[in-house]
């Protein structure tokens, strides 16, 4: 083993990534078919119909499932969902798969987290690569807005209350 006087894997700091970290964002869970992914880079566009736009990993199974099924569920997560968010983000092990970390209900849009009070059933409108992400633009078809106590927020690379 070698002891380094500096970081052993020096990388230049990415100013765009640092800007994104300073913005922070509400953590959501996107599911479609048998796939899911935590997403904190998202926005909602008001209109008739309303829309949800999310930046997702272009190599993720979620992208493939959304494009194949054309529908999905977007749920807003709470502090109690931290472990589930880590499992769907691929940062912690999930023996048996990430869907074993929660209780699920089946909807016409796919599986939704049963104890997430706010969720939207969405229909995919378009998927475009932008930067190192895929921009999923989805029409809100069904929406339930519930209690928002103790939201799960991601800022500077960690979860906050």
Language model segments and positions:
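Basic, polyanion-binding surface patches
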Residues: 2-161
């Amino acid at each position: 083993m070698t002891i380094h006087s500096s970081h052993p894997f020096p990388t230049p700091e990415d100013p765009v990534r640092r800007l994104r970290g300073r913005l922070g964002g509400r953590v959501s869970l996107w599911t479609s078919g048998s796939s899911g992914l935590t997403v904190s880079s998202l926005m909602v566009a008001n209109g008739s119909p309303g829309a949800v736009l999310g930046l997702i990993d272009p190599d993720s199974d979620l992208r493939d499932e959304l494009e194949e099924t054309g529908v999905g569920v977007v749920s807003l997560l709470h502090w109690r969902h931290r472990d589930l968010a880590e499992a769907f983000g691929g940062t912690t092990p999930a023996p048996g798969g990430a869907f074993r970390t929660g209780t699920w209900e089946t909807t016409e849009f796919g599986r939704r987290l049963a104890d997430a009070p706010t969720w939207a059933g969405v229909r995919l409108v378009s998927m475009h690569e932008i930067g190192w992400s895929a921009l999923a633009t989805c029409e809100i078809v069904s929406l339930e807005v519930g209690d928002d106590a103790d939201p799960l927020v991601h800022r500077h690379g960690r979860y906050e209350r």
